[in-house]
């Protein structure tokens, strides 16, 4: 058996949306937390924070490793004393690259109530807005008022509109799961101080 070289036809290059540049070194502090891009070493702690939240669907530890490696431009980690204590992970929607979808946001119990979750989302939006992103989307189940309040606070601080519509009914999930509503914040211009 011999290997065959495959040739590809010559075609005009397709202009694709530019991905958000990954390793951004600009860090901010909120209280004692440093907000920064993720590192592979953060994945295990991010997985634990998600698992301990008891609200998020916990993905495999492998998924968080990939997230830290492949999506550093749309992920922000909160660090205190060298340890991850919170995170927001998201991605640019392929069908709508001007929209960042927030997949998960969580903060360890020791950091809750300090505005860390809101600061993580604000940092993410500040990071992606210069790249043409104008909207944020996320899904939240109706039984999670803390998340709803957090995203409402982000919208207020940005002077943006927060809209809600049903997205996934409980019946579409293969397991027992609450329905998920789609929340959208737009426009996500710079934070109003």
From Swiss-Prot:
Give the EC number: 2.3.1.178
What EC class is this? transferase
Q: Which residues form the N-acetyltransferase domain?
A: 33-185
Xref: InterPro entries: Acyl_CoA_acyltransferase (IPR016181), Ectoine_EctA (IPR012772), GNAT_dom (IPR000182)
By its UniProt entry, which SUPFAM superfamilies does this protein fall under? Acyl-CoA N-acyltransferases (Nat) (SSF55729)
In residue numbers, the region (Disordered) covers: 1-22
Name recorded for this polypeptide:
L-2,4-diaminobutyric acid acetyltransferase
